[in-house]
Amino acid sequence: MSNDRLLQNVVSILLMTGYNVSERCEIRPRSFDLMTSKGENLLVIKVVSQIDSVNEDIAWDLDKIARHLHAVPLIIGERARDVALERGAIYLRYGINAVSSATLYDYLAEGELPLVYASPGGLYVNIDAERLRTLREEQAMSLGDLAHALGVSRRTISKYEGGMGTTLEMAMRLEEFFNDDIVMPIDLLHYTPAEEEHVPASLASGHNPESDAQPKRPEDHLRSIGINVQELRRAPFHAFAMFENKTILTCYGSPQKTVQRAELVGNISQITGTHSLCVVSDYRKEKKIGKTLVIGEERLKNVEDGEDLLEMVTEEK
């Protein structure tokens, strides 16, 4: 299946299950293809045929977007190392969940949570460690007793009760032995970023958006007036500008690329409940394109503080 058909399939699943879906991101390079929301759930989605094509730089962007928008990053694909993704299984790319479109459908449309995850060596499941310990103790079995019954070491059983995952085969043996459910399903809409953000070695400090390198003045000025600026590498917006619990999706560029970028970023801001701003070089006007405020660099220099900027981006033109 081509990337376009796969993307259309994903959009159909999202719309069918009641999600609001952003316009497709056509700007290159791009770390994601869609933003989608339903209630309190916000997803940032990358669609690729081969999930191995998602490199560390893209994953870093996905994680950073998820952190700042309280979203869930998700990769939808078909294959990993030329092997089809198993339906109902979760794969990982640099800490980001990756699933097939069929698994996405099962989760969103049928309410079926994945049970297995792929790891070197095969498919594994998470065990309800507390439930396993309770079942063993209810039958007055020691760690050694259970280990002997299953033909594994005492240390292995201890690790299971400590939260270590196991193979699908062993999980089935445990459930058959106790005649009870101990496998824990995996919630696709749950994402916990690592405590410390990992920055790939390939990412230099500062934003280096495209080959026609953009000037640093816009983000430098935003920082100078007390706005927290968090830059991205491959998103259609170049940075999050944050002030007083408000987030502005911010992009910089030349007039030639402004209209397409401004319309897309404005659409994304509606899905994510944020605001949007494009700062354009050699530009003298101030107007709205869709939901995005478009101003020139000189106008930005006259913005004195974050409150002034928030008032500008929220004002209807």
Swiss-Prot record:
InterPro entries: Arc_TR_HTH (IPR020886), Cro/C1-type_HTH (IPR001387), Lambda_DNA-bd_dom_sf (IPR010982)
PROSITE patterns: HTH_CROC1
Domain named HTH cro/C1-type: residues: 132-189
Record field: compositional bias (Basic and acidic residues): 209-219
Family annotation (Pfam families): HTH_3
Region Disordered, residue ranges: 199-219
Stretches assigned to coiled coil: none
A single GO molecular function term of this UniProt record: DNA-binding transcription factor activity
Superkingdom of source: Archaea
SUPFAM superfamilies xref list: lambda repressor-like DNA-binding domains
Residues in the DNA-binding region annotation: 143-162
Protein name (database record): Putative HTH-type transcriptional regulatory protein Mlab_0160
The species this protein was found in: Methanocorpusculum labreanum (strain ATCC 43576 / DSM 4855 / Z)
Organism ancestry: Archaea, Methanobacteriati, Methanobacteriota, Stenosarchaea group, Methanomicrobia
